[in-house]
Amino acid sequence: MLAKRIIPCLDVRDGQVVKGVQFRNHEIIGDIVPLAKRYAEEGADELVFYDITASSDGRVVDKSWVSRVAEVIDIPFCVAGGIKSLEDAAKILSFGADKISINSPALADPTLITRLADRFGVQCIVVGIDTWYDAETGKYHVNQYTGDESRTRVTQWETLDWVQEVQKRGAGEIVLNMMNQDGVRNGYDLEQLKKVREVCHVPLIASGGAGTMEHFLEAFRDADVDGALAASVFHKQIINISELKTYLATQGVEIRIC
């Protein structure tokens, strides 16, 4: 059995790490490189960086901080933000990133997933899916351009359909960003994760809602996700990664202990 992964997420805007609640009202957390270094030293398995306004601004991720992160950490890291072409992806990988993640650009042009997978290999192509639960209809819908509140829109895709579509097109991993849960720290949406797990045959990463160590355990044990991504609990030092991993190991979760 492959070890489960603990993945801190760093949302980047204007060269700094920020964090919002349900993708809104972002506050500044701190500088990118020191945070990345701290998480690597605490025992994170991987880091994910989202330049949250790159897609809506029509630009690609800034090279300067990607290169600096690559210099100070020795764990894999994934970068997302405005990647719309093979050239964009090649640049970011050349800066030192191990994986690239696409989200809004994939919705605009789904063939991008296949072209990236063919060029760089499925192992480094992650598709992020921003999913919102509509209580009125009881359905999960995919959102686009969520880094900019003024441009965020609900797409025609239902989440389960899009999960299947991106796999057909070559996604090597899926990060499910559950917007309703984002930043509120009351647990991952296990119901949604279980439904997605049934149709997701590539590594699935849960994102949105972690507030306690038990929430991570539930995601691994009850929804069988491959990794759990979180931001607030790590940024605010509510949970220490090393202590979290020790706890999970005592609960029978296969995890890499540093």
From Swiss-Prot:
<keyword id="KW-0963">Cytoplasm</keyword>
<feature type="active site">
    <location>
        <position position="130"/>
    </location>
</feature>
<keyword id="KW-0368">Histidine biosynthesis</keyword>
<dbReference type="InterPro" id="IPR011060">
    <property type="entry name" value="RibuloseP-bd_barrel"/>
</dbReference>
<dbReference type="GO" id="GO:0000105">
    <property type="term" value="P:L-histidine biosynthetic process"/>
</dbReference>
<comment type="function">
    <text>IGPS catalyzes the conversion of PRFAR and glutamine to IGP, AICAR and glutamate. The HisF subunit catalyzes the cyclization activity that produces IGP and AICAR from PRFAR using the ammonia provided by the HisH subunit.</text>
</comment>
<feature type="active site">
    <location>
        <position position="11"/>
    </location>
</feature>
<dbReference type="InterPro" id="IPR004651">
    <property type="entry name" value="HisF"/>
</dbReference>
<dbReference type="InterPro" id="IPR050064">
    <property type="entry name" value="IGPS_HisA/HisF"/>
</dbReference>
<dbReference type="InterPro" id="IPR006062">
    <property type="entry name" value="His_biosynth"/>
</dbReference>
<comment type="pathway">
    <text>Amino-acid biosynthesis; L-histidine biosynthesis; L-histidine from 5-phospho-alpha-D-ribose 1-diphosphate: step 5/9.</text>
</comment>
<dbReference type="GO" id="GO:0000107">
    <property type="term" value="F:imidazoleglycerol-phosphate synthase activity"/>
</dbReference>
<dbReference type="Pfam" id="PF00977">
    <property type="entry name" value="His_biosynth"/>
</dbReference>
<protein>
    <recommendedName>
        <fullName>Imidazole glycerol phosphate synthase subunit HisF</fullName>
        <ecNumber>4.3.2.10</ecNumber>
    </recommendedName>
</protein>
<comment type="similarity">
    <text>Belongs to the HisA/HisF family.</text>
</comment>
<comment type="subunit">
    <text>Heterodimer of HisH and HisF.</text>
</comment>
<dbReference type="InterPro" id="IPR013785">
    <property type="entry name" value="Aldolase_TIM"/>
</dbReference>
<dbReference type="GO" id="GO:0016829">
    <property type="term" value="F:lyase activity"/>
</dbReference>
<dbReference type="GO" id="GO:0005737">
    <property type="term" value="C:cytoplasm"/>
</dbReference>
<keyword id="KW-0028">Amino-acid biosynthesis</keyword>
<keyword id="KW-0456">Lyase</keyword>
